[in-house]
From Swiss-Prot:
Protein name stated in the entry: Protein STRICTOSIDINE SYNTHASE-LIKE 13
Biological function: Required for the exine formation during pollen development.
Record-annotated disulphide pairs: none
Signal peptide bounds: 1-42
GO cellular component assignments: vacuole
Residue runs in coiled coils: none
Keywords: Developmental protein, Glycoprotein, Signal, Vacuole
Gene that this polypeptide is encoded by: SSL13
Length: 403
């Protein structure tokens, strides 16, 4: 009897199951991505399942701002004057705001007569010719220059010294004096390895500086891969000025981002962007050293800041979708989906993701006190920075009841 070889089996399958064969070959082609046409672009891509609260559970209980008050009452200021102003700070004399830009500068607002002036840069390698690209600064055209120019993200003033501390995505933790200039590096390595993606910081009353390192594998220019993979190599770090040493406080975090000490500094809050949640880390008391999830969020959180009452404002890129949850829970689908030769914007749109800004106010226990939305995606006085756009948003606050 004649035996069927592999070639004969393949022909038989093509004859009897042509659609299945085409699907199988298509999946194989996509998995290989030979022409590097997908958003992954030939990179090593190993998506994993990560911890996100169920979509229905979060969205079913989340209070919505049906009046879209942020969108209707917020104002866009300094349009095309500031590029990717991530964090906003005022100094102890009330001057500012100060903000870090996508071109590597920290700038300060000097009033209408003068406008914005360069206050500091994070490296002596910075030059206007190499780094300043105007409105293109917040596009991928700037990414290849960020390692040279720097990308200052988190800013905090020391209330007593007036020094400005900077978390730069490429140059780590730095400090610059009240008069500005070139910042001095404080922490670029921890345990002998580079800090790859410093993101935000806060200063404890004892002088220690807590800051987030978003990933040990990807820098800021490749931050989308942190989200797409669901990898959790991020860390919470602490720099101690007296000893000039940096320590790992927490590790295994999924895109740790914004950070804020509580009013009494017994704990700090930080956001985990990938896992869509607000997390508490206890610094004092019977729970010292413990970690708690205080709020599951409807979208991807960025910065967190405190108000005078000890409540917390959290900026969120909203909102999650059911399709996105399917990808989150099924890494193998993600592995195929993001290897499709389709632009990322279209892949996101297919998942129903149309991002807009939500600003939410929480108490110390994670209870939602207020939600402000910009459902039109345009965007206090709340001052609202944005890492991806070329403006600052402000909102008269508090809003009156009829607003």
């Amino acid at each position: 009897m004649e035996k069927k070889g592999q070639h004969g089996t393949y022909e038989s399958m093509m004859t009897h199951h042509p659609i299945l064969c085409i699907i199988a070959l298509s999946v194989l082609f996509i998995a290989i991505d030979p022409f590097h046409m997908s958003p992954i672009g030939g990179r090593e891509f190993k998506p994993v399942k990560h911890e996100v609260a169920p979509y229905k559970e979060v969205m079913g209980s989340w209070p919505r701002d049906n009046l879209s008050r942020l969108g209707n009452h917020g104002k866009l200021e300094f349009v095309d004057q500031v590029f990717g102003p991530e964090s906003l700070e005022f100094d102890s004399l009330g001057r500012g705001p100060y903000t870090g830009l996508a071109d590597g500068r920290v700038v300060r607002w000097m009033g209408e007569a003068i406008g914005w002036e360069t206050f500091s840069v994070v490296t002596s390698k910075w030059s206007e010719e190499a780094c300043v690209r105007g409105v293109d600064s917040t596009t991928n055209k700037q990414w290849k220059h960020e390692k040279l120019c720097g990308r200052p993200l988190g800013l905090r003033f020391h209330k007593e010294t007036g020094n400005l501390y900077i978390a730069d995505a490429y140059y780590g933790l730095l400090v610059v004096g009240p008069e500005g200039g070139i910042a001095t590096p404080l922490a670029t390595h921890v345990e002998g390895k580079p800090i790859l993606f410093a993101n935000d910081l806060d200063i404890h009353r004892n002088g220690s500086i807590f800051f987030t390192d978003t990933s040990k594998r990807y820098d800021r220019a490749n931050h989308f891969f942190i989200l797409l993979e669901g990898e959790s190599t991020g860390r919470l770090l602490r720099y101690d000025p007296p000893t000039k040493t940096t320590h790992i406080v927490l590790e295994g975090l999924a895109f740790p981002n914004g950070i804020q000490l509580s009013k009494d500094q017994s704990f700090l809050l930080f956001t985990e962007t990938t896992n869509c949640r607000l997390v508490k880390y206890w610094l004092e008391g019977p729970k010292m050293g413990e970690v708690e999830v205080v709020a599951d969020l409807p979208g991807f959180p960025d910065n967190v800041r405190i108000n005078e009452e000890g409540q917390f404002w959290v900026a969120i890129d909203c909102c999650r979708t059911p399709a996105q949850e399917v990808l989150t829970n099924n890494p193998w689908i993600r592995s195929i989906y993001f290897r499709l030769p389709i632009p990322m914007k279209l892949l996101a749109k297919t998942m129903g993701m149309r991002m807009y800004t939500v600003i939410s106010r929480f108490d110390e226990e994670g209870k939602v006190l207020e939600v402000l939305e910009d459902r039109q995606g345009k965007v206090m006085k709340l001052w609202i920075g944005t890492v991806a756009h070329n403006h600052i948003a402000t909102l008269p606050y508090p809003l009156t009841m009829n607003q």
